[in-house]
């Protein structure tokens, strides 16, 4: 714990300077970001980030420069800083070391990020899951709460050493929900909805300098339409950061492979001022970079854990500790 506090004390001034410099000289600052990323000890993760930024630096017409300018013009820098440190150091560096050690010790898969479905009625269950997950080195969480509750906001607030991506409906964004997150800096909200709902939500989020993204769903039937240029352009108005693509139900391997390769292609082309992420495939890719595994897990509101290593057996975290559930997925 002391070592982690010391590491944060060393990293935080570098992040502060980097964010300050981004406003004045994005291109030069990005070169400093490259140096900072390479200073992190997790080589596999650093090298992949380095490759992405190098492509950006060699492309003078990259839309990612527009992305950066949009971020620094509206976003609360404390929000970006807290989320980045928690994700970059606590989750992907310090926590990842614990994950690798416990994974070897127990000969099981432990994910770098845990997806959790929740609502007001299941907040105690969610809080307990996160408590157990942190003991395993997991400090990155994707929380799915369609109608954001005060209980969910409080869970994110008290776990301020973690990074949260909160997936919710755009219709849930209101003065009330924005006020609930007024002092919470370790969260990225991702919204989904109709054009009118997205327009209203993004206006409110920008006005309040919130860190947010947008997400959309795909399945075997509509996966090809995800990459239509008209649709890619459509999302430009509703995110300054990420476009998260999420499978709606069990997709065929063909669909998953198609999404993986084409999402990477969109990122490499750098034509749109957001970063496209395929939640399923990119979660696995990052997991492999960080832990050497290829594992993802989601826990539904009933406490059932599902993973990409499914064998048809259901395991419930209300019947046994999280680690014991993960031990069911032997390497």
Feature-to-residue mapping (PLM):
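Solvent-exposed, charged interface segments at domain starts and junctions
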Residues: 9-38, 113, 199-219, 223-227
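Conserved C-terminal portion of the radical SAM core fold
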Residues: 118, 140, 199-306
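A short acidic, amphipathic alpha-helical/loop segment
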Residues: 128-132, 151-156, 175-180, 197-205, ...
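N-terminal [4Fe-4S]-dependent radical SAM core
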Residues: 43-115
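Core AdoMet radical
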Residues: 112-124, 133-149, 159-174, 180-197, ...
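Extended hydrophobic/Leu-rich segments
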Residues: 102, 255-256, 326
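N-terminal start-of-chain detector that recognizes signal peptides
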Residues: 85-91, 138, 160-163, 269-271
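Accessory C-terminal segments flanking Radical SAM cores
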Residues: 1-31, 35-47, 263-331
């Amino acid at each position: 714990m002391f070592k982690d506090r010391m590491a944060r004390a060393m990293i935080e001034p570098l992040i502060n300077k980097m964010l300050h410099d981004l406003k004045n000289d994005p291109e030069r600052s990005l070169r400093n970001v490259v140096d900072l990323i390479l200073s992190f000890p997790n080589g596999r993760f650093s090298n992949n980030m380095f490759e992405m930024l190098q492509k950006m630096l060699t492309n003078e017409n990259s839309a990612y420069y527009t992305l950066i300018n949009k971020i620094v013009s509206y976003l609360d820098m404390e929000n970006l800083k807290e989320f980045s440190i928690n994700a970059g150091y606590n989750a992907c560096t310090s926590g990842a070391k614990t994950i690798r050690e416990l994974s070897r010790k127990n000969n099981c898969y432990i994910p770098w990020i845990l997806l959790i479905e929740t609502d007001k009625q299941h907040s105690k269950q969610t809080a307990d899951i996160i408590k157990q997950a942190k003991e395993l080195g997991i400090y990155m969480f994707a929380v799915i709460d369609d109608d954001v509750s005060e209980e969910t906001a409080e869970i994110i607030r008290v776990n301020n050493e973690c990074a949260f991506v909160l997936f919710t409906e755009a219709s849930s964004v209101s003065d009330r929900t924005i006020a609930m997150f007024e002092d919470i800096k370790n969260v990225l909200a991702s919204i989904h909805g109709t054009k009118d709902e997205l327009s209203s939500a993004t206006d409110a989020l920008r006005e309040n300098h919130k860190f947010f993204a947008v997400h959309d769903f795909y399945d075997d039937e509509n996966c090809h339409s995800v990459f239509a240029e008209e649709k890619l352009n459509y999302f430009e108005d509703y995110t300054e950061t990420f476009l998260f693509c999420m499978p709606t139900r069990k997709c065929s391997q063909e669909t998953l492979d198609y999404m993986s390769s084409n999402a990477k292609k969109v990122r490499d082309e750098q034509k749109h001022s957001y970063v496209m992420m395929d939640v399923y495939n990119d979660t696995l890719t990052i997991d492999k970079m960080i832990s050497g595994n290829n594992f993802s897990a989601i826990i539904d509101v009933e406490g059932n854990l599902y993973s990409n290593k499914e064998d048809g057996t259901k395991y419930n975290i209300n019947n046994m500790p999280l680690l014991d559930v993960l031990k069911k997925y032997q390497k």
